[in-house]
Structures are given as C-alpha cells and as structure tokens.
C-alpha cells in the first residue's frame, strides 16, 4: 500500500521530534514555497575583486541619466559598484593630513617608519595614502609611495607610524626624505566588544564621544610628567575630568590621584598593560575614568564599543553616507566622477555625530537620530535626540521662524538604534521602544508618537517595511507594526535562534527582503562566530495566523539589497581569512567581502569560474505509521517500507532521501540513505 506523506510548510524547532509530528524540524539552504520545500537559488560573484572589510550597508539607486549604481560601505571603506567594476570613494580625513613626514628604513627589513611633525592620531589597522614622496632612502623610490595605499602596522609613538613594504630595504637610513600622508576616515572596529579594556581598541576615542582636552606640554618616553620630570601632567583644561582616575593619551593609559587647576597630580605612566611613549605638546587627551573600570575583564562591562557601521541613502541622485556616530558625506554620480571620493557635506550647521540617518518623503527633510544637541559639537551627542534639516536642504539645520528645521528628544530607552522610512511615517526604534515620526506641517513640522514599549530593535539594520507593515528583530523576539499596534510575532524557531545569537556581535544583524519569494531574512552571528554566519527567514506571503512559516539556514550575508534597480538581489559575504584585493593596500590584513548576485542558478559560482554545489536539505519530525484505511497508528503498527516514489518539480543534481526509523520515541534512530538521480527515479528499499 502506498502512503502519501504531506507535511506543513516551515520549521518547528520548539517541539521535540515526536511532538513535531507532521512538520519539518531541520533545514539548510532551503525555503518553503506554495506549501512545499525547495532549495534556495544559487549565487554568482559579480566582480573578481574582494573588498576590504566587512559589509555594513548597501544601497542601490538610479541617477537622472538612468545609470544604475550600488554603494557598499564596509568597516574600512566606501565603494561604488557600476557596470561590473568597483570604485573606491572612501573619504579622506583632510584635517589629519601630514605633510613633510620622513622615512626611516632598516636594512633587510620590510618595515618603514614614517615620522610626522605633529601628532598623527593613527591606530594600527588604519589606511593611509602616501603622495609626493621625495628622496626616499633604503633603496626604495618615490614610485613605491606616490598614490599608494598602506595599512598602518604599528604606532610606536604619537609621531611615528610603521608600515610594511612588499620588499626589504637595501640599507639602513633616515630619518630623511619627505612624503605627504592622508588618512582614510576611520569607520570603526570590525566587531562589537564590551568595555574599553585594553585589547578592545578605543579607536583613538573616535567611536564614542569622550570628554577630551590636549596636553599643555610634551611627555617623554619615560615614567615622568610634563617635560620629563615630576609626577604632574599639565593639560589645557580639566573641565569635566574625574577628580581622580585615568586618562588616555594616544595608546598610553595614565592614572592620576588628584587635580590642581589644570594639572593632574600623582600620575603613574603606562598602566593596565599599556606602554609608556612620547607624546607631543597638544596631543589629544581623553578622560577614561567614568567609562569603564580599567583593567577589569571586558565581559563585566556594559559599555559597548560598537562596530563600524554606515547608513547609505540617496538624496535626489546624490549618495548620502553617514558613518555611525560620526558625520555625513556626499557623492555626486556624474560619470567622470566615478573615481572622485565622497566629501563631507559642507556647512557650519551640519551635525558631526549621529547614530542613524533617513530622508523623509515626500517632504524631503534629512533626519539624524541619536545626534548632537549643539550643532557642530560632537561632544554634545545625545543618543535619544532627533534633529532634522530645513526642507529640501542638507546644510541648514538651525531652526528659525522662517524654516522647517527642528529637533525633538525621545525618552523611552537608553539610545536610539535605528530608523527607516515607512509608507506613512518614519519609524524610529530605541533599545526598548518604537516611535512614529509623521510630517504634520507648521508650526511643529513633525509629530512623534510612541507606539510600542518593550519592543526595541537589535541593531541599526534589523528593520524593514513590506507592504505597509514594519518587521524587525528585537533582542528576544520578532515584531511587526501594521499602523495600529506593535505585535509580537509567533515563531516556532525563536528558541533556536535567540539562544544561539552572539550577543557580543548582535550589532551586525542585517535584515534582507527578497520580494521574489515573499521572504524577510535576518542574518545574524551565532554563538560560535564573531561574524554573521546564520540566518532566519519569515515567509510573509504564505504565512497565516494558524501556521506562520519560518525557516533557518547557514546562508551568511552581511548586507543585502532588494531586487528592483537590478533584477536580482545583491549581497555581501564577509570571510575573515580571505585576503582583500580591492583597493590595493600594501600590507593589508586578511578580512574581505565577496559581492554576490543572489537567486542565480543553483550553485555558488566565483568570477574565476570555480563552482561549488550548494547542498540543501529538509528533515521532518517523527511520523506515525498509518493503519488500514488511513488510520493513524499512534505507535501500534509496524511496517516494512519497500519503495519510495519521489515527487519533484525540477531537479538539478542528485537528491538523497534518508529514512530514519525507530520503534519508540526515545529509541536511537536507524538511518538508511537512498539516492534519486532524476525526478522520476523510483527507490526500492
């Protein structure tokens, strides 16, 4: 007797295998469509180059001439993809430019030391651009440096930078010669960590605004204070500094026991595992005392060093790019401009520190969330403060009686995590609540309403709107908002997902909409990984209240853009052990992103032609054996299975069917494998 097996679409990972009778319980690289499982589509590499860093945001748009672009921001660089090629448009931090730096070489060594005349504020891992080199020593030439990018290998002091060449020096020489050094804007760390304990990297205080001042006199590479004597350090100002505590100067931590006027007393140099170093007069000095217990295990701190993030949008045909907790850049997409770098949005009123940015439509106000209360003052950044520009302007932000610029502070939560533009409102999330921001016109311009509590989002890029409904991933569940109320979504894979998320890396969570198959996917890092390595998908087209359809996968993408501008979704995948190739940076460390066209064929295809098969599977829960006339057995029937007739729609490659049988729910299953080479293969057991 033939027995038809039909199972509900979606996975049930909340129940035991026996409790999930009639359902699927495991799957990988598979989706459910029209009620049946199928393998997901393949992907094809768009460009042979691998990008530096991990993708953090991606945006596609069309300019006024009809040209199609994709912008990709990683934790290291900003790129344009246009007609099959990448273009590096990473902005330069012009305020940090160093001219007249000198070279020092050591015979037989690849290390070259660049000495600057003033403090460079660089960190190991930064990218620098050298130019106008003259009289280069050690057997190197100007062509080895002019218009060449380098990764900073080490920072021995406030005025020295070490880089690694591709070949060794022929002689020891220097300091001599000159070179101009430009610095790529620092986007932020690769991974999210807790605390400011040494080893987590403070990024020169550039990740979060700290109380800061400058040295009033140089420090030598010794154990003494200002000028190489005593136990006092003179600062330009001590306003806001703790009465006793710790300061950070370049990469050195220094403790002090008291303050007299603008002088720190009782200093101890090179504390908590750091080394003493020379620091020039005017070097930036941070008060680290109130942010973390220095020397404590970072896992005990609730202070988060967030990973480098971007928000990419278009304003008309121009790309607007916000570095998380920093400022706004703009790139104009005229064809001759493809190799021109993004530049700061100019103006004396533009915010310099914001957590996220959106453009409201159709009224066209640029909105910054988690931004500064005093324009052009990053130290006044308030994580709960919202500010918007004058209508149709990116540079006018000061409210007046004759414009529509304005601001509003929200209250529920400790910080605003992100915002998106919805069909009828801008949606803003804190770590605990959701707000709507609607254009209402003069005199207030925007009206705010809190529409949900205890429903915060998990990361800046974890929310999307589809068909007028906002969906997002919170710290412990999935939510949706249909314009009326926030609802917690029933999910039969939630324990599997939320018990396996690396909460030290959850800022990397990225949402993806695949309208081709009615899917919303969240890519997340599992407990076993510092980077995105898994995903969970909700099928919004076929789900019902009685049967919400969810499934999980090891498909890992750090960014994703919906089809529309291009006919398929485009996505980035980060690989920590892969060497980046674009742009060419001498001495660059491993850690690169592939750029994929999704839903292309059935395999993984690299630009080199290398093809890897994608092995998808689905696994059901236990299934009772049926008795006469379809009677369910509930365990009292025994059966011998002699043949299987698969019913496949379209099959590429072989399909293996595994039967796992057991006499009792707690018995060890016995598995047998059978391979179907075509969709009409009959299997005899």
Language-model regions, residue ranges each:
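Beta-propeller and closely related beta-pinwheel folds
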Residues: 42-61, 90-95, 292-305, 337-509, ...
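Structural hallmark of WD40 beta-propellers
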Residues: 66-69, 317, 424
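Hydrophobic or amphipathic alpha-helical targeting/insertion segments
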Residues: 88, 186, 317-331
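Short beta-strand segments and strand-loop junctions that repeat across beta-rich extracellular domains
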Residues: 77-81, 189-198, 328-333, 373-400, ...
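Beta-sheet repeat architectures centered on beta-propellers
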Residues: 1-96, 189, 194, 311, ...
